[in-house]
């Protein structure tokens, strides 16, 4: 529970490299996510190459932190593995698990949306040489935090409805 409430979007990182063990731990958390009919329609592209990380902000306006990140992981949906249209939910669950594991491991992270924005999908597919059946869903930027952000309580009782919709 601590990681859930402590997790914050971190966009500034130190120069310390992430170990392969930490990256694997984060990937294992992503792959532990629930998926519809247990299809697990995901693939993950680890980006450590600074030249590639510098290209992404040219087409993704909210990814300016990537050149300073230790690495990024692109969460992709594989339409050849998905029997239906639930792969975005599955990739969302995988992305969230990765953010929580990063927090638990002391790594800063931020979720960068790709899908369904074609102006982000197509350039990223080209940059990473992704096959036609692979759709980039999100990018998780990772690095040792060079900033701190305090957790906040987002619970809002006015958004809770019991049995049917009523204003509380």
Give residue spans per PLM region.
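Acidic, surface-exposed loops and disordered segments
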Residues: 1-168
